[in-house]
Amino acid sequence: DGGVRHLLGDATYPFDVMRITCDDADGRRQTRYAHNIAEIGLGANVELARRRLPARLGARRRRFLGFWHGYAATRRRTLHVGYDMKSWDGVGFHVVIGNGQFTSGIRLSPRSYPGDGVLDALVFTGQKSDAYTMMPRIMRHGGHVPDDAIKELRAKIRFSVEADRPLAVIADGEPFGTTPATFQVVPQQILLKL
């Protein structure tokens, strides 16, 4: 009885979600929802490579080998990122769209809050080698921003990401499809009971 008494109160926290539209494996547009973080480029390549490795290797080896396989498969690409009524064009190797801060225990999008009605994007524009020189700062405390090699963008409505060739998209750790992709904020769709 006492263990569930807090459920009777009115204390809730409203979470936003992301409505993601991208191409599936057959080139058809699909729409799905996610609540935390989406990744395009390096992060997606790493996760897809990790999933292809045999489970008998164990979780640590799969993460380690997945990073290096995904890293090897990643190239810097010409990107067009639309956000609300603005846009950014440039070259990058990794795009993070954040509604929440953490993925797999890593504070990847440190300025994102899931109930603020805003999506944040980080476009990694530096050299691909920045991926492993930045990792200690990211893994320790999310101290990778601000950085001259990371473009920070915010959108109250939506992001769109296009590249000079299709790039893999994952969200909340699950494969979603490929670019072109849009990420629309859907405010306060989940109520978390406190």
Give the location of each predicted region.
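Catalytic core of DAGKc-family lipid kinases
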Residues: 1-93
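ATP/nucleoside-binding phosphotransfer catalytic cores, i.e., glycine-rich phosphate-binding loops
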Residues: 83-89, 113, 123-194
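Gly/Ser/Thr-rich active-site loops/lids in small-molecule metabolic enzymes
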Residues: 54-62, 103-105, 111-132
